[in-house]
From Swiss-Prot:
It comes from the Bacteria. Disulfide bonds: none annotated. Keywords: Nodulation, Plasmid. InterPro entries: HotDog_dom_sf, MaoC-like_dom, NodN-like. To the R.meliloti counterpart. CDD domains: NodN. The lineage of its organism: Bacteria, Pseudomonadati, Pseudomonadota, Alphaproteobacteria, Hyphomicrobiales. Residues 9-133 form the MaoC-like domain. Involved in the production of the root hair deformation (HAD) factor specifically on medicago. Transmembrane segments: none annotated. This is Nodulation protein N. The gene is nodN. It comes from Rhizobium leguminosarum bv. viciae. Pfam families: MaoC_dehydratas.
Length: 161
């Protein structure tokens, strides 16, 4: 994985900064997410029933499971910021669940930097236009604007910014 410096980040606005590895969304992952979130709707956890009673032909991942995979996608696909000491979620805007992720599908994230702003002495707030693609599908699973905070040592703040 390549690296960027804090000083380089603003010049990358409008560019795709990363594309993650493919992640397989299997029934075990879906079941564990259902247990963690107490969301046991049949379309997620009952393959036989979902095959008969849902329009999907089987179980599908929770939309929020797909969304939560952004962290893993970030780690596998985004450049490391050299000066970063910690990363934080700040929020999400315009989250849209576009297509269901069928059990056994593979998904990956694409990250386009759309905004960044230095705040205070030690934070860079970034916004990424994120698309989660489903392998061999035309429509994405989801799109969102993901806002993150890159924390860094104040002594590493780029000069003049």
């Amino acid at each position: 994985m390549h690296e960027l410096s804090l000083a380089d980040v603003p010049s990358r606005i409008g560019q795709e900064l990363g594309k993650s590895e493919w992640i397989t969304v299997d029934q075990t992952t879906i079941d564990l997410f259902a247990d963690a979130t107490h969301d046991h709707q049949f379309i997620h956890v009952h393959p036989e029933r979902a095959a008969v009673e849902s329009p999907f032909g089987g179980t599908i991942a929770h939309g929020f499971l797909t969304l939560s995979l952004l962290s893993a996608m970030n780690f596998s696909g985004m450049p490391k910021i050299r000066e970063q000491t910690m990363g934080l979620n700040y929020g999400l805007d315009r989250v849209r669940f576009m297509s269901p992720v069928k059990t056994g599908s593979r998904v990956r994230g694409r990250f386009v930097l759309s905004e960044c702003q230095f705040r205070g002495a030690s934070m860079l707030v970034t916004t990424y236009e994120v698309t989660v693609e489903i392998e061999n599908e035309n429509r994405p699973a989801l799109t969102a604007n993901w806002i993150t905070i890159i924390q860094f040592d104040p002594n590493d703040r780029p000069k003049g910014i």
